[in-house]
UniProtKB/Swiss-Prot annotation:
Its main location: membrane. The lineage of its organism: Eukaryota, Amoebozoa, Evosea, Eumycetozoa, Dictyostelia. The gene is abcB6. The chain crosses the membrane at residues 95-115, 128-148, 206-226, 230-250, 314-334, 346-366. This is ABC transporter B family member 6. GO terms for biological process: transmembrane transport. One of its GO terms (molecular function) is ATP hydrolysis activity.
Amino acid sequence: MGRFGAVSYRQVKQSEADTIEIDSLKNGDIEKYNEENDKISRIPLAQLSINKINGIKSSVIEELSLKRPSYFMATKMIKSLLPYYWKKNPFKFRIILCVSIIFFSKLINLSVPLIFKNIINTLPEKVEWHLLILYGVLFLIQKSIWDIRDLLFQDVNDSATKQINLETFDHLHRLSLSYHLNKRTGSLIKIVERGTSSVVQLLSLLLFNIFPTLVELFTVSTFLLFSYGAEFAFINLTSCVVYIAFTLYVTERRTKHRRLANKKENEASDIKVDSLMNFETIKYFTAESYERKRYDFALMDFFQTNKKSKVSYFLLNFGQSSIIVIGTTLGLGLATWRASQNGFTLGDVIAINTFIAQMFSPLSWLGSSYRMILTAFTDMENLFELLDTQPEVSDSPNAKELNFNDTNNPSKTILPSIEFRNISFTYPNKNKEQQQSSPKILDNISFTVPAGKSIALVGSTGGGKSTIFRLLCRFYDVDQGEILINGENIKDVTQTSLRSIIGVVPQETVLFNDTVAYNIGFGNREANDDQLIDASRRAQILSFIESSPDGFRTVVGERGLRLSGGEKQRVSIARALLKDPPILILDEASSSLDTFTERKIQQAINEVSKGRTTLVIAHRLSTIIHCDEILVLKGGHIVERGSHSYLLDFNGDYAHLWNQQQLSASDLQYTPNQDTFE
């Protein structure tokens, strides 16, 4: 069950999607959809980007999906927001005080025109100075009371904003790796930013715009009915009802333009973020003009879509203004005619005109508020879908912490052993039929890493080496079999305790846009300076850090762009050393290092691997000859296993690969039309 109730957003959207699909098939729109898919197939592969694919998708299907918002979901959203506001006594008191201010302000709104009426009616015989002073005081309160209300409510809003942001942030980190691999960072950021601001905006609009307007409509109409007659109450009510109905009708129909504009803006943002994140690659291929054209096309698409939204906005405002003018003119005309018949005083005419004009003032905000509410609903849909998404990998209800303490001596830690038992795995696919027909990445493999020993995995790219590490860290759950650490299935322990004992040096190191010290210290945030320096020295990165003008305060740039590949790799090694984990994973830990530095790093790795359970992925076989056992993976199977010397004597795939790598550079000969060196 999702956070926002028993009926999840995903279930509602699925129901809507099913309806859309049936409608589209009935209308023959699927033929147009297929025609536009044919357009995609005719694009040269080198120019086929995801943005072009999305741009050619059938507009018919898109518009069907944007036809109407779900009021059922809107109700659930409002209920879901209440706990963020109605939670602590100080905040409850402030909300009650703000609502009291609303009723007080409506009494003032009724009093001001009546006082002004009495001032006018006493002229020119005399001037009621006490009424003038009272009018000025009430008018000042009328203008400033909303600022007082906003000031009182600010802390409530800030608290709700903070809580929603933190919950969204935590939820993003709880989601599985596969979710993030299938999402674009730019779109996620936009979803969170727009959705979070809309969540906070929605309740404020309902509480301080819609509710006060309805209260004022009731009080003004009631007063006009008993003080001036049913015709004035009728004009006021009819004008307001027509205004509200027109606003609701037009605004609902312009919502689809807003949704489509959001989608196009997300696509433009994705292109911009991807382009900046691949800054260096763009420079290598002198692709600045091409990227500019891509971004220009996306912006043009967004502005064309947004223009439709702006036109519909103009039509809405024009219609609202027309209704206001007609209602005000009718009320003023009737009051003037009554005055000409000696039925009303001049003060009555001014009071009636003021009441009607004063009523339309919040009504003008009602239209804006309703548009903003629908906009907030539109922006919140993606956020709530995100929050309703459940991670593919989650802790079981009875999950326990991994414990390596010796039962006989609790202060002593037992080194962990690792066992992969009959493991089969295929990466998840939304299309279940495609997943079932996809080849298995791992097919019924079994092996054991004894406590304190090291095992290396070698083989061709795509053979399943990195998949084994991802399964061990439980980024995915296996399709078949079980992974055991000290005899415990990793599905029965918490993910946090599992990953806390594993240190990883990935093949492609991604660093935070922060200092070198922060990135190394990420391995152990409680480490002191001496420990951090020692880890840097053992990773052969200390001399580089000390030679930099800012030392450990050197900022590495976005994703570590200011560092070379070898420097990033050594920072990653230092981070793993600082964590001091009982299980160490080295995924091509020396892949970005020169031969001289590689030898130094290898010595450090050999040293730090002692007393740990270690798994190593390597293409350079010279780095794994010290491992206790080497597994050769091919097609998801273990085809060879044994020590370095045993596998050389076996003279199989490992020996062939070893002999190739031992050839001197002068002996390497590239054969055309082949993908390997011979």
